[in-house]
């Protein structure tokens, strides 16, 4: 494929100028948090629902399109609503296989402008919370991957079920979902599908 054709396809991206103000669940903002410790780099793929602040994170050793497809599949299993829109930055991992996967599922993909963290404010706040409350406490250099996975899943369950958020009137995301969207307790706490 000639070089100029590759760039003309990129012009068809839907760009957003403002942070979404959704009141119904299903608008997801995603980002990648890069953490390096003692020469080891991990890429934490994070996603947050705008309306409910439901958050999910998982880490990979590489920032590839296949890894974000895997992350997306994991997120779909634990997110209790249908995904309608997926907002992300212009990173190379958000193109290719991932774009095709979103099209197959009928999900609109929108891109934020570079160097505009206010557009991704919800996921940037989640990244900060993940870094301060989990990564700074546990680090990323745990010997066994299964041990780290268990700690991360435990923290995600805590974040979504017990941690109070000011943006939700001091309720956790799952409490907010139960009150506002009348869902059963059983469907919200099943995390066994997160395992690879």
Predicted regions and their residues:
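RNase H-like two-metal-ion nuclease catalytic core shared by retroviral integrases
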Residues: 88-103, 109-133, 143-149, 153, ...
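Short, conserved catalytic/metal-binding motifs centered on acidic residues
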Residues: 31, 53, 89, 120, ...
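Active-site beta-loop-alpha junctions of metal-dependent nucleic acid enzymes
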Residues: 40, 57-81
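Short small-residue beta-strand/loop micro-motif enriched in glycine and branched aliphatics
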Residues: 53-58, 110-112, 136
């Amino acid at each position: 494929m000639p070089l100029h054709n590759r760039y003309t396809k990129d012009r068809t991206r839907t760009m957003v100028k403002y942070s979404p103000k959704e009141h119904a669940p299903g608008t997801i903002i995603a980002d990648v948090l890069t953490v390096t410790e003692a020469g080891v780099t991990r890429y934490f793929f994070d996603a947050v629902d705008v309306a409910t602040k439901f958050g999910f994170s998982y880490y990979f050793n590489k920032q590839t399109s296949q890894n974000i497809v895997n992350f997306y599949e994991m997120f779909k299993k634990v997110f209790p609503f249908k995904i309608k829109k997926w907002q992300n930055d212009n990173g190379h991992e958000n193109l290719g296989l991932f774009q095709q996967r979103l099209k197959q599922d009928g999900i609109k993909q929108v891109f934020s402008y570079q160097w505009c963290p206010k557009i991704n404010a919800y996921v940037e706040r989640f990244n900060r919370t993940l870094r301060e409350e989990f990564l700074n406490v546990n680090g990323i250099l745990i010997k066994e991957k299964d041990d780290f996975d268990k700690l991360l899943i435990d923290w995600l369950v805590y974040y979504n079920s017990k941690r109070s958020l000011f943006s939700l009137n001091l309720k956790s995301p799952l409490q907010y979902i139960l009150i506002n969207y009348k869902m059963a307790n059983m469907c919200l706490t099943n995390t066994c599908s997160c395992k690879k």
